[in-house]
Amino acid sequence: MNNPTKSVTIEELKTDNGIFCRQTYTSTSQDCLVLVMGYGGSLRIWPATFVNRLAESFRVITYDNRGTGLSIIPQKPEEYTVKVMADDLFDVIDTLGINSHHLLGYSMGGCMALQYAHDHQDFVKSLFLLSSTAGGDLYAKPDRAISNALANPEGKTLWDIYMSTFSLMYAPEVLQRCMPTIEAIYEVSKECPTRPIALAGHSNAFRGFDGTSYLPGIKVPTTIVAGKNDRLMPVQNSMNIAENLSNSSLVLLDDCEHGPHIQNEDEIVDLIFKSAAKC
């Protein structure tokens, strides 16, 4: 798939509750697609190439989770829960006047997407869960060393910390291949890094999430995608969701890890287009 050649328009605003959001679209954008970033990530962590290619068909909505980017930064970890963060998403949707949209959640963002789909199912045309989990008894944990390294990234510089995290996501040879995208992400996000209090809050939110009881009631068409070699969110998590979500399809990617939209961008963009077209 070629890179988009259409002119991309970007509009930004902050809701009254302090959530910063962005709309990216082209002359051919139609339905809205909302992207929900995961642990510690602002909207700048979405690769521009990924967003711009999606904008050829969708009006793409991205936003800074609380504690990240230009959004509010609550100072107590207990002020961060998946429920509250899903409410932040609805604040964005309500502010933009959107009443129907596709929804994609990545990693911990998939937890927020599940919560949102449970709370506002009538708004969701289709759901994409990318490298995510339902939590609770369906959560398959990564190795403890991986979890500890994610929670405590090492490095003397911000770049070192970024690389510490991305090295958990990808094997060395994959990391090298994805380096141009990673460097681009760093350049657009380095001016507003996520603070330690927000990382503690996001950890609190993830630990407290249990969406297992939501799965039987979610009826929207759902595409579940995972890399078979994911070390951060073991593939069993996606398999567990698929087994308990009736209107779902499971796509497992060979030789893919915890960032299919970066490692396998062409395949993921094509999958989103095809899945959304069925709804």
Q: Residue spans of the language-model regions?
A:
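Flexible "cap/lid" loop of the alpha/beta hydrolase fold
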Residues: 118, 125-155
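Short beta-strand/loop motif that positions the catalytic acidic residue
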Residues: 218, 224-226, 230
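Conserved HGGG/HGGXW glycine-rich cap/lid loop of the alpha/beta-hydrolase fold
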Residues: 17-73
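Catalytic histidine-centered segment of alpha/beta-hydrolase-like enzymes
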Residues: 253-269
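Active-site loop/oxyanion-hole signature of alpha/beta-hydrolase fold enzymes
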Residues: 61-62, 67-104, 270
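Gly/Ala-rich beta-loop-alpha elbow adjacent to hydrolase catalytic centers
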Residues: 105-109, 113
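Conserved alpha/beta-hydrolase catalytic His-Asp/Glu region
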Residues: 138-139, 160-214
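Conserved alpha/beta-hydrolase "acid-adjacent" motif
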Residues: 231-237
